[in-house]
Amino acid sequence: MKITIIGSGAWGSTLAQVLTDNNNQVLLYDINLSYVEKINQGKHPIFNAPLVNVKAVSCLKQALDYSDLIVLSVPMKFMRHLLKQIALMLTTPKSFVNVSKGIEPLTFLRVSEIVKQVIPAPLLANFASLMGPSHAEEVILRKLTLLTAASSNPAFALEIQKLFSCPNYLKVYTSSDLVGNEICSAFKNVLAFINGILVAKNFGINSQAALMSRGILEMSVLVTFYQGNPQTVLGLPGLGDLIVTAFSKYSRNFNAGAKIAAGITYQQIIDSSLQTIEGFQTLNAFYQLQLKHNLDLPIIQASYQLIFESKPFETVFATLMQRPFKSEF
């Protein structure tokens, strides 16, 4: 099967390997000419690893015309602009699979909602998300990984499950809760920030366990608000992705939290990072959402104060500890 991947960063290029391992034909698109050149030379553009039987182009129209299945692997801040470009170029219906994590600031929309808003209905065949605990650094080495394909169309979820599952190292489950999967995958980045701060400040495992437990509760509040299934919080895109993002040395968001603890501002982190750190934009979006709808999300509030307002950790921590006594649930 022919498949187009939009965005040849760490994850997009790694998924190209997954698909070619399953004997599919993959064409990557990127505006980064250096990435395109490396891929066409048989090299992964980010990691020191081969990437064979994959081609790349810098022409979006050529990439879109290549296949009827489009994988979206671009940072959230570029998603709407990219989709507007795609909408202008489509002449036949396409199916989309999103692998980017986050929600859009100001609108609070998920990727599936942006796609439906921008791509004309006659040209949108199907949509699914592919999420879960999946550091590209491990998948490129073909280490065991589990993901979830979520779609409101069960048949399409099954199609994506079969397409991306590799018997030796990658297994995909299906879900009908597209909403929950998208929200969980976005929210876990916020908890990774805070865990990075806790570790950098030598807090113990007790505090990290407390953060994860109360954080999962806030995750379920958001999933319920968006009318998703709270059970999804316990799945791969929820608890699974949270563990990977909040505790791994590969996690950009965890490492960003450690830098925040060292006194580096979020803008300095963004300016010095070679790869996108989605959590900053996601945190801002969730903070504005909870203000607008009066949601009780104390970890979101504390995270925003630490990262965007540069409040002292001791002050923010004291505020959290002084919240009124209450039942756990």
From Swiss-Prot:
Protein name, as recorded: Glycerol-3-phosphate dehydrogenase [NAD(P)+]
Pfam families: NAD_Gly3P_dh_C, NAD_Gly3P_dh_N
Superkingdom of this protein's organism: Bacteria
Enzyme class: oxidoreductase
Enzyme Commission code(s) on record: 1.1.1.94
List of catalytic residues: 188 (proton acceptor)
Any one Gene Ontology molecular-function term assigned to this protein's record: NAD binding
Any one GO BP annotation for this protein: glycerophospholipid metabolic process
Family assignment from sequence similarity: Belongs to the NAD-dependent glycerol-3-phosphate dehydrogenase family.
Subcellular location(s) per record: Cytoplasm
Functional summary from the UniProt entry: Catalyzes the reduction of the glycolytic intermediate dihydroxyacetone phosphate (DHAP) to sn-glycerol 3-phosphate (G3P), the key precursor for phospholipid synthesis.
Binding residues annotated for NADPH, in chain numbering: 11, 101, 136, 252, 278
Organism lineage string: Bacteria, Bacillati, Mycoplasmatota, Mollicutes, Acholeplasmatales
GO annotations of cellular component type: cytosol
Keyword vocabulary terms for this entry: Cytoplasm, Lipid biosynthesis, Lipid metabolism, NAD, NADP, Nucleotide-binding, Oxidoreductase, Phospholipid biosynthesis, Phospholipid metabolism
Record-linked SUPFAM superfamilies: 6-phosphogluconate dehydrogenase C-terminal domain-like, NAD(P)-binding Rossmann-fold domains
Reactions that this protein is recorded to catalyse: sn-glycerol 3-phosphate + NAD(+) = dihydroxyacetone phosphate + NADH + H(+); sn-glycerol 3-phosphate + NADP(+) = dihydroxyacetone phosphate + NADPH + H(+)
Organism expressing this protein natively: Onion yellows phytoplasma (strain OY-M)
Presence of the UniProt keyword Protein transport in the record: no
Binding annotation for sn-glycerol 3-phosphate: 101, 132, 134, 188, 241, 251-253
Pathway: Membrane lipid metabolism; glycerophospholipid metabolism
